[in-house]
Regions:
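Conserved AMP-binding/adenylation subdomain of ANL enzymes
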Residues: 132-150, 160-202, 217
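Conserved pre-ATP/AMP-binding loop-to-beta segment of ANL
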Residues: 81, 91-113, 120, 128-130, ...
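AMP-binding/adenylate-forming catalytic core of the ANL superfamily
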Residues: 2, 27, 31-52, 197, ...
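Conserved AMP-binding/adenylate-forming
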Residues: 1-31, 35, 152-157, 359
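Conserved ATP/PPi-binding loop(s) of AMP-dependent carboxylate-activating enzymes
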Residues: 279-283, 294-325, 342, 360, ...
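ANL superfamily adenylate-forming
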Residues: 47-105
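Conserved helix-loop-beta element of the AMP-binding
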Residues: 44-48, 65-79, 150-152, 178, ...
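Gly/Ser/Thr-rich phosphate-binding loop
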Residues: 202-205, 215-272, 285
Length: 474
């Protein structure tokens, strides 16, 4: 098990495991002793490679005491990486190179928990052969990385995006991968742009959350970027257009931890439709179906399912119900497909808002809110109402210090804005937040917002970002 920040030693540990046929499992930093212990008890590792500290927004955060408390009584060895000490590198230099261990194509390479945005994380196991083929193909043909170019993803290595495109795919193609410790916008968004320009990054893979943060801070600076891909959440048309105008040509794509690499995408060679993630990639069969698995006509909202999932698909799933039913892989997402075969992702099916007879995906509401000039970020959930569910929205204002006395007026404007775009639905409830709760992979934790509003148990929040604050509601 690897418990390290975004430093080269984390990549060394992962690659070393791959070379000798061992299975690696990377865990996110910031877990408390109990959460870390639960994961270690589930994983039962023989070796834990752990850092004594990491940096968050420029400040050192000690974790050695957390690790020592978590491993009490567990049968495992710990290899410490001590910040500022040469001991770790000295041990590497003294070691003899290990011969690569031949393994079958489906031999487990790593185990990775899902992001846990809608519940308790599951353990996804990926193998060597198909996974490597899938991620290398995607980096070349979806993200269009060319020989000699530099690739950078803002995703941490503990997330599937970091595994696939922060480490393995760039190395498989002989490219250069840029790893950066700390938040992308630290110490400022300007530093992010300068880093891209100074290090000659050609292709960026980030999340809509990062793009929204950059937009909120003002106009971007020239970077030399050729492409800016987005993954992890729905990329709204408004943020797609901002990215094209201020950063680089956007490449939207959709996939999951279980799939290992993009399944739907709009590679730069294809016409883009802002708000639509794209078309099924080679080796992927996608459709929109009803509850019984029957195909729905274009323009209908339904379950996104896959008949074929591509070569990078997981080889095993631990601790969760199989997503396969009736010969189809049920993704858990609500989607639409248009007449040309382009898919639009509307949100997780368990987060769909049922307003009367209509089903509204949270992404639909959030995309509308993001077109308002005074909205920086937004999240939508369904809450009990008089005649079913009502829409509740949580908004981060564009202005960093939005006057408290003006919030009721803005709330009324946003209600009218939503009704103007979504049609006859009950007036939504509007709440303001300084920031939204996110997983460490950048996904909005809507279930936490809903739980806060209804006074319910939010469930597992161990994957929550460290700097989340509830803010204020009007």
């Amino acid at each position: 098990t690897i418990y390290l920040p975004m430093i080269p030693e984390a990549a060394y540990a992962m690659l070393a495991c791959a070379r000798i046929g061992a299975v690696h499992a990377a865990l996110p930093l910031g877990l408390g002793p109990e959460a870390l212990r639960r994961r270690l008890e589930d994983l039962r590792p023989r070796l834990l490679v752990a850092a004594d500290a990491y940096f968050y927004r420029g400040q050192p955060v000690r974790v050695r005491e957390v690790v020592e408390a978590a491993i009490q009584g567990l049968d495992l060895k710990v290899l410490w990486h001590v910040r500022g000490s040469p001991e770790f590198l000295e041990r590497l230099y003294e070691a003899r190179p290990a011969e690569p261990e031949p393994v079958p194509a489906a031999h487990p390479l790593f185990l990775l928990p899902t992001s846990g945005s809608t519940g308790k994380p599951k353990g996804v196991v990926h193998g060597h052969g198909g996974y490597m083929v899938g991620v290398a193909w995607a980096l070349r043909h979806v993200f269009d990385l060319k020989p000699g170019e530099v690739f950078h993803t803002t995703a941490d290595l503990f997330w599937i995006v970091g595994h696939s495109f922060g480490l393995y795919a760039p190395l498989l193609l002989g490219g250069t991968s840029l790893l950066v410790e700390d938040r992308p916008d630290h110490p400022s968004p300007g530093a992010f742009y300068e880093r891209l320009a100074h290090l000659g990054v050609d292709v960026l893979l980030t999340s809509p959350a990062v793009l929204r943060t950059l937009r909120r801070h003002g106009e971007a600076r020239p970077t030399g970027l050729r492409l800016a891909a987005s993954v992890g959440e729905v990329l709204s048309p408004e943020i797609w257009r901002w990215t094209r105008e201020h950063l680089a040509w956007p490449v939207d794509n959709w996939w999951q931890t279980e799939l290992g690499a993009p399944a739907l995408a709009t590679p730069p060679a294809l016409p883009a439709k802002p708000g639509h993630v794209g078309l099924p990639l080679p080796g992927v069969e996608a459709r929109v179906v009803d509850e019984e698995g029957r195909p729905l006509p274009p323009g209908s909202k339904g379950h996104l399912v896959l008949g074929a999932t591509g070569p990078a698909h997981m080889v095993d799933l631990q601790g969760g119900r199989s997503p396969w039913r009736g010969g189809l892989y049920w993704t858990g997402d609500l989607a639409e497909m248009d007449e040309e075969g382009y898919f639009r992702i509307l949100g997780r099916t368990e987060e769909v808002i049922k307003v009367g007879e209509a089903r509204i995906g949270p992404a639909e509401v959030e995309a509308v809110l993001l077109t308002h000039p005074q909205v920086a970020e937004a999240a939508a959930v369904g809450v009990p109402g008089e005649t079913g569910e009502e829409i509740a929205v949580f908004v981060v204002p564009q202005a960093r210090e939005f006057p408290e006395e003006l919030k009721p007026l803005l709330a009324e404007k946003l209600k009218a804005h939503i009704l103007r775009h979504l049609g006859p639905v009950p007036p939504p409830r509007v709440f303001f937040r300084e920031r939204l709760p996110r997983t460490r992979s950048g996904k909005i934790l809507r279930r936490l917002l809903k739980a806060e509003l209804l006074g319910l148990d939010p469930g597992d929040t161990s994957g929550l970002e460290e700097d989340y604050g509830a803010g204020k509601a009007p």
